[in-house]
């Protein structure tokens, strides 16, 4: 090489491998030393040598050259181990999905990065002349990332949306990919191909816009005479030396530089490498340099402000088109880099945080008051410190002090023992970097179907008050309680209600019909009554033919009923214990329009019937009236059926048990209609008392009468009662004969003879004596409606006789009750009908036996669901009433869950027992729960949760563990097994004494109560039933394991405790097991036996627990929950949405949009937003400090200078992160163009510019000086597109965008284009004013320079201006130190303006 270059003795011989960067540096040194012509000869020789060597050795690539890194195996294994632990934590609910994702990215990113760093040393040691190594290291072909994929591992890939796929590709291309890895790679490759195409065009367009903005900027003068400069401090530690050198080299000094008394640099001297080295060694004062920002010319630039030309080492020539060079040098790396990066195929890059490690082993100590507990980004517990925290680590011989910067996370606890090099703190990365964070939504989908449960309060998000989007206020768990759902679409409303029980054998097993089952297998006092559903015997729908329809009355039959709730509006508060069976009356009487009627079945809230209780009632439509009136019973003096205090309130039926007295039978009653209007006192009445009116007479201003007849007006307290009686008037003959007929009913044959009309009346009449005045009197005869009452029908032996039953059956009697007392006026509310008679079904039993031990019956509704068809049955059990009922307190809030820890008490509804003084030391609490239909937004399909006893693992006390599925075959022979698992009634225990049951044989272990509950030393043998607690909207269905109809998705785990119940808990964890409590996986409930699945305790027995499987999902505060509490989720439904920040991936492709956003000043971007805000802030503050005229001037000046520096630094950062070096002055020329305009504000009135007009800053300053008055303006940031459309040349604007609009506007305004730029001249075919074409322009302008300009006489303003603007280092330094300290970039500190 030495020989080839030149035969010179003084050249130094270098023997080392050089890459592209080193060659660049070499060439620039050669140009400095030898000049251009000589250097090109040297380079030609170098090229020849290179080609010769390459062809001689035939550098090529073989597959054997790809050497895998030896340490890869154990690194990958280690990462997999960490991922496995992470997966476990996520499964236990300690870490949520976003934290898991972040952590797994960091685990694999760190592994991948480590392998990448190992790569070069590995090649260098094992095979330095490996062709792969040579090519990638020299940068000739491929980069480190690609080689890393060939011999390291591909790592994490992005999907087309730019999201990370959390399955890393562990293989490299040398080993070959597995099928899954190949498919994931294809994602990345496709993203690469698409992005390359899109981004190349983006980069091209960016270049076009950049050139458009600055095409007219040409070097036209040698010196503009400015004294301003920008300070760069060599002693600033924040700026790396490389960037410092790059900033200064080729610039021109704006001021002399002194080193003590000695001047080491003169003004207008260009800075070479020698001068820079002197600056660095001497650490001089800040150096003031000239930049394009400080140039005073408006539409061009001078040589000294631009500095050296990048092509050769001298000052730039006059006439050089530096604007176009600047635009292209910024745009070009974009195109190049898009093409280059993307051959790595969408490999994901993340960032890792900086760590502080312990210097030695020892105990760590710090002040706990200064830290706050928090969670790290990965879900680990940590402490956050807000100020500098001093941490001491005491080892045996030495004490180390470590300072932890503010906003760091401390990962260890106080007094913890740490080992050397253990990570003790994490410095928050990215507080000052440009890596823009973007907010990403991550949806979490549920893995299983089930019921939603929250363990904390949840806010309604304000914009969705009525929807099901909720915001979490604090970190908590969401639980999905497992359970299948069953939708029933045939019945219009779902019938599953509170306190439902379902019999085990009432569902058809293998498509058998249920009719035989329900009669023969029903050995308990379990009564079914149900209306008939005929037909549909195909498809295994049960046939109810043997259960004939009951409840026949004279007029109506129950046929094809539909069953409704008491309220059909599902969202209303439902009546809990009843529903109405609607039916149509068979003979619709003369097609009258009647409201639908139905049988209402009511069960008392505690579910207990005494004798002669009303089981159901039926409001017969024929006893229904729309008008007011009075009832009279058949004969005068008939005893009232009801005692007075037991009158039933008809509307809003409460829990009533009226004591009915059946002393006398009433076979008919009478109803005397009348029209009644109740009016306020103030109303003006248009009729007189005792006058006779016709139909539709106006009574008041707004009311007309519906019937004609006699008017009676009575004044009562604060109101007027207006009655209209219809009927005939009779004037009697003899007074004494009539008197006894006052207000009585007269049968058809006993009509008065001596009235004028002595006709025979065919109907009953009601006679009233009326005296309008003392002398006048007459008899008013009113028509009467008569109602016949049928006798009570006794439906004895209603239900089929049970074979094994020893007692009599229940019987039902029909009784008619008149709802209103004798002679009581009945007031109808307009539009509602009045029911006069209610037909009731009375429940009775054991009438023949004198001493029956059974005092009450327990009733509940039973639902049977087969093939989606739901039937409702009533089940009645007879029993003695000597058991203590556990009743629910009357609590409006509904039953909630009882939690163990205080913090989770969301909705607690305690239940109390009869033994109020009971102290329960550690016994399982037994609670009653409710069942409810779930409210779906879909009104057509109601869904409900079904609990089946399959998947129910039973661990018997005496036998070994049996899986329930194994027992299935033997269940027909041995009834005991089905008993232990058939789920008992909800809530209160039924009477077990007389419980002759095929299902519930008395096989529960008798327990002596004193052993566990101290019930005032009351010793009893108690049958323990399995108690259930469901949360608010649960639904339970007992069913057989063999049934396929019911979804068997309810996982129950039977968990047994040992006999010595108290000593059985883990010693460390004093768990108190309470019903409804949630357990995480592997929590220790009993000694030595951690529970294997997470879930909720729903049954507590003395020797066992049943746990309903549940899956916890952790959600941090700010997450949104998408479902209501208790709603049913299906697999794959959206459960939670997390919003988290992630740094955008570092690609130039992602970088290009960043550069574009900065240059276009787009508001979506945080950079320009902060700049805009900052500009406004400076404008206000400075104006406030300095007053108006100076404030605007200096404010705009300062603002513009500061924002320019900020923009330059931001753009440089993006390119530098990609390893692209662009000289600052190119970016400065562009930034100068987009910040050189100011907006005239409306504050000051000036005659020159209109408010809102955009003018150049220098023009504004000059006009202000010329006019000697202040022009108010403020700085604005224009984007490059806007700046291109706001130039001095309309031809250039028209050739860029919106041609017609620009030309039309220019024509209307009469704009003049001076053809100063390149584009205008190209469009018009003239000579462009650069290079040789510049000479003529220069020649012309010299002639103009000789004409002297007249200066205005007053120079005070100019002098003051100079004082402030040109000798204002102190002032500006003051401003920058006080007002501009919040600038976000590091380089500011060394790149401040003077």
From Swiss-Prot:
It is an enzyme of class 2 (transferase). Keywords: Chloroplast, DNA-directed RNA polymerase, Metal-binding, Nucleotidyltransferase, Plastid, Transcription, Transferase, Zinc. Pfam families: RNA_pol_Rpb1_4, RNA_pol_Rpb1_5. Gene3D superfamilies: 1.10.132.30, 1.10.150.390, 1.10.1790.20, RNA polymerase Rpb1, domain 3. Zn(2+) binds at residues 224, 295, 302, 305. It catalyses: RNA(n) + a ribonucleoside 5'-triphosphate = RNA(n+1) + diphosphate. One of its GO terms (molecular function) is zinc ion binding. The keyword Ion transport does not apply. Its cofactor is Zn(2+). It is found in: Plastid, Chloroplast. The keyword Coiled coil does not apply. Its EC number is 2.7.7.6. InterPro entries: DNA-dir_RpoC2_beta_pp, RNA_pol_beta''_euk, RNA_pol_Rpb1_3_sf, RNA_pol_Rpb1_4, RNA_pol_Rpb1_5, Rpb1_funnel_sf. GO terms for biological process: DNA-templated transcription. CDD domains: RNAP_beta'_C. GO terms for cellular component: chloroplast; DNA-directed RNA polymerase complex; mitochondrion. Binds 1 Zn(2+) ion per subunit. HAMAP family: RNApol_bact_RpoC2 (MF_01324). In plastids the minimal PEP RNA polymerase catalytic core is composed of four subunits: alpha, beta, beta', and beta''. When a (nuclear-encoded) sigma factor is associated with the core the holoenzyme is formed, which can initiate transcription. PANTHER family: DNA-DIRECTED RNA POLYMERASE SUBUNIT BETA. DNA-dependent RNA polymerase catalyzes the transcription of DNA into RNA using the four ribonucleoside triphosphates as substrates. Belongs to the RNA polymerase beta' chain family. RpoC2 subfamily. This is DNA-directed RNA polymerase subunit beta''. The lineage of its organism: Eukaryota, Viridiplantae, Streptophyta, Embryophyta, Tracheophyta.
């Amino acid at each position: 090489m030495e020989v080839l270059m030149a035969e010179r003795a003084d050249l130094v011989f270098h023997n080392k491998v050089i890459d592209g960067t080193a060659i660049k540096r070499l060439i620039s040194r050669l140009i400095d030393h030898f000049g251009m012509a000589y250097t090109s000869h040297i380079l030609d020789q170098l090229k020849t040598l290179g080609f010769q060597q390459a062809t001689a050795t035939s550098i090529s690539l073989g597959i054997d050259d790809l050497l895998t890194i030896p340490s890869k195996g154990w690194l990958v294994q280690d990462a997999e181990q960490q991922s496995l632990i992470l997966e476990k934590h996520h499964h236990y609910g300690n870490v949520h999905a976003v934290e898991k994702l972040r952590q797994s990215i960091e685990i694999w990113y760190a592994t991948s990065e480590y392998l990448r760093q190992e790569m070069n040393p590995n090649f260098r040691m094992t095979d330095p002349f490996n062709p792969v190594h040579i090519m990638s290291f020299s940068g000739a072909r491929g980069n480190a990332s690609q080689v890393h994929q060939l011999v390291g591992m591909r790592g994490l890939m992005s999907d087309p949306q730019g999201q990370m796929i959390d399955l890393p590709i562990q293989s490299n291309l040398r080993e070959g990919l597995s099928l899954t890895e190949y498919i994931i790679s294809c994602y990345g490759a496709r993203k690469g191909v698409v992005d390359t195409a899109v981004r190349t065009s983006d980069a091209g367009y960016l270049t076009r816009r950049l050139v458009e903005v600055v095409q007219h900027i040409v070097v036209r003068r040698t010196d503009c005479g400015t004294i301003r400069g920008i300070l760069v401090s060599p002693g600033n530690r924040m700026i790396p030396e490389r960037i410092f050198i790059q900033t200064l080299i080729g610039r021109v000094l704006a001021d002399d530089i002194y080193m003590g008394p000695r001047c080491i640099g003169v003004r207008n001297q260009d800075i070479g490498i020698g001068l820079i080295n002197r600056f660095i060694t001497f650490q001089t004062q800040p150096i003031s340099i000239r930049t394009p920002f400080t140039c005073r010319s408006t539409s061009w630039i001078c040589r000294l402000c631009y500095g050296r030309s990048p092509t050769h080492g001298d000052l730039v020539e006059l006439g050089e088109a530096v604007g176009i060079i600047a635009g292209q040098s910024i745009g070009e790396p974009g195109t190049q880099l898009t093409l280059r990066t993307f051959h790595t195929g969408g490999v994901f890059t993340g960032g890792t945080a900086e760590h502080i490690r312990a210097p030695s082993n020892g105990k760590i100590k710090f002040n706990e008051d200064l830290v706050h507990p928090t969670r790290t980004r990965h879900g680990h517990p940590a402490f956050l410190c807000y100020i500098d925290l001093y941490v001491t680590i005491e080892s045996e011989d030495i004490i180390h002090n470590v300072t932890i910067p503010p906003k760091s996370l401390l990962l260890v606890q106080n007094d913890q023992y740490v080992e050397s090099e253990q990570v003790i703190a994490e410095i928050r990365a990215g507080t000052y970097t440009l890596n823009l964070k973007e907010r990403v939504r991550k949806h979490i989908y549920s893995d299983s179907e089930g019921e939603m449960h929250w363990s904390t309060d949840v806010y309604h998000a304000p914009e969705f008050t009525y929807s099901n989007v909720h915001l979490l206020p604090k970190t908590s768990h969401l639980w999905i309680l497992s359970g299948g759902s069953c939708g029933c679409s045939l019945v219009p409303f779902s019938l599953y209600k509170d306190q439902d029980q379902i019999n085990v054998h009432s569902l058809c097993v293998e498509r058998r019909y249920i009719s035989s089952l329900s009669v023969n297998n029903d050995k308990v006092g379990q009564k079914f009554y149900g209306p008939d559903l005929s037909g549909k015997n195909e498809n295994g729908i049960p046939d109810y033919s043997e259960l004939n329809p009951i409840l026949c009355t004279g007029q109506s039959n129950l046929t094809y009923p539909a069953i409704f709730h008491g309220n059909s509006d599902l969202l209303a508060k439902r009546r809990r214990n009843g529903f109405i069976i609607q039916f149509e009356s068979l003979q619709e009487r003369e097609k009258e329009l009647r409201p639908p009627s139905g049988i209402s079945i009511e069960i008392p809230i505690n579910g207990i019937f005494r004798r002669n209780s009303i089981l159901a009632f039926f409001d017969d439509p024929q006893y229904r009236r729309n008008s007011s009136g009075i009832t009279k019973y058949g004969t005068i003096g008939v005893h009232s059926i009801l005692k007075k205090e037991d009158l039933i309130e008809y509307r809003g039926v409460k829990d009533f048990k009226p004591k009915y007295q059946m002393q006398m039978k009433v076979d008919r009653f009478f109803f005397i209609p009348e029209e009644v209007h109740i009016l306020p006192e103030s109303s003006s009445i248009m009729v007189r008392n005792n006058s006779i009116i016709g139909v539709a007479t106006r009574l008041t201003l707004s009311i007309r009468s519906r019937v004609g007849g006699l008017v009676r007006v009575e004044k009562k307290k604060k109101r007027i009662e207006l009655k209209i009686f219809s009927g005939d008037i009779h004037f009697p003959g003899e007074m004494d004969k009539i008197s006894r007929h006052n207000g009585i009913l007269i049968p058809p044959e006993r009509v008065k003879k001596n009235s004028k009309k002595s006709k025979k009346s065919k109907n009953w009449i009601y006679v009233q004596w009326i005296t309008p005045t003392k002398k006048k009197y007459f008899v008013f005869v009113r028509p009467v409606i008569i109602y016949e009452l049928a006798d009570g029908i006794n439906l004895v032996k209603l239900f089929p006789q049970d074979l094994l039953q020893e007692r009599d059956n229940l019987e039902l009697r029909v009784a008619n009750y008149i709802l209103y007392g004798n002679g009581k006026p009945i007031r109808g509310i307009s539009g509602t009908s009045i029911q006069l008679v209610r037909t009731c079904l009375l429940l009775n039993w054991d009438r023949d036996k004198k001493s029956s031990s059974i005092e009450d019956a327990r009733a509940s509704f039973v639902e049977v669901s087969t093939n989606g068809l739901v039937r409702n049955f009533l089940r009645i059990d007879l029993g003695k009433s000597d058991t203590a009922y556990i009743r629910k307190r009357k609590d409006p809030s509904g039953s909630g869950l009882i939690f163990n820890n205080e913090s989770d008490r969301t909705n607690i509804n305690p239940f109390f027992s009869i033994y109020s003084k009971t102290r329960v030391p550690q016994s399982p609490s037994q609670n009653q729960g409710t069942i409810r239909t779930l409210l779906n937004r879909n009104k057509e399909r109601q869904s409900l949760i079904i609990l089946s006893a399959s998947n129910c693992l039973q661990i018997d006390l005496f036998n070994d563990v049996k899986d329930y599925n194994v027992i299935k075959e033997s269940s027909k022979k041995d009834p005991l097994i089905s008993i232990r698992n058939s789920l008992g009634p909800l809530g209160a225990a039924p009477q077990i004494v007389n419980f002759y049951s095929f299902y519930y044989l008395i096989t529960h272990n008798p327990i002596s109560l004193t052993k566990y509950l101290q019930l005032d030393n009351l010793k009893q043998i108690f049958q323990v039933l399995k108690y259930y607690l469901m949360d608010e909207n649960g639904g339970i269905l007992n069913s057989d394991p063999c049934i396929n109809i019911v979804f068997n998705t309810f996982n129950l785990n039977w968990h047994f405790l040992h006999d010595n119940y108290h000593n059985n808990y883990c010693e460390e964890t004093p768990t108190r097991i309470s019903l409804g409590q949630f357990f995480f996986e592997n929590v220790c409930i009993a000694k030595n036996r951690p529970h294997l699945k997470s879930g909720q305790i729903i049954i507590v027995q003395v020797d066992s627990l049943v746990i309903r499987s549940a899956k916890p999902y952790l959600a941090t505060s700010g997450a949104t929950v998408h479902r209501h509490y208790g709603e049913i989720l299906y697999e794959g439904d959206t459960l939670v949405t997390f919003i988290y920040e992630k740094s955008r991936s570092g690609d130039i492709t992602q970088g290009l949009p960043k550069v574009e956003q900065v240059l276009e000043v787009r508001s979506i971007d945080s950079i320009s937003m902060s700049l805009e805000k900052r500009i406004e802030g400076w404008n206000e503050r400075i104006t406030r400090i300095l007053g108006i005229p100076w404030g605007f001037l200096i404010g705009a000046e300062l603002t513009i200078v500061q924002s320019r520096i900020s923009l330059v630094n931001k753009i440089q950062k993006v390119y530098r992160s990609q390893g692209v070096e662009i000289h600052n002055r190119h970016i400065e020329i562009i930034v100068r163009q987009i910040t050189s305009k100011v907006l005239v504000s409306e504050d000051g009135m000036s005659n020159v510019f209109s408010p809102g007009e955009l003018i150049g800053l220098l023009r504004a300053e000059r006009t202000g000086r010329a006019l000697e008055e202040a022009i108010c303006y403020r700085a604005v940031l224009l984007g490059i597109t806007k700046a291109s459309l706001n130039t001095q040349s309309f031809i250039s604007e028209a050739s860029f965008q919106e041609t017609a609009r620009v030309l039309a506007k220019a024509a209307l305004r009469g704009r003049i284009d001076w053809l100063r730029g390149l584009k205008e001249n190209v469009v018009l075919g003239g000579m462009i004013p650069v290079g040789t074409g510049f000479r003529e322009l220069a020649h012309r302008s010299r002639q103009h320079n000789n004409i002297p300009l007249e200066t205005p006489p007053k120079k005070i303003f100019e002098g003051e201006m100079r004082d402030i603007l040109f000798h204002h280092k102190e002032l500006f330094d003051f401003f920058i130190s006080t007002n501009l300290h919040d600038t976000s970039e590091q380089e500011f500190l060394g790149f401040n303006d003077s």
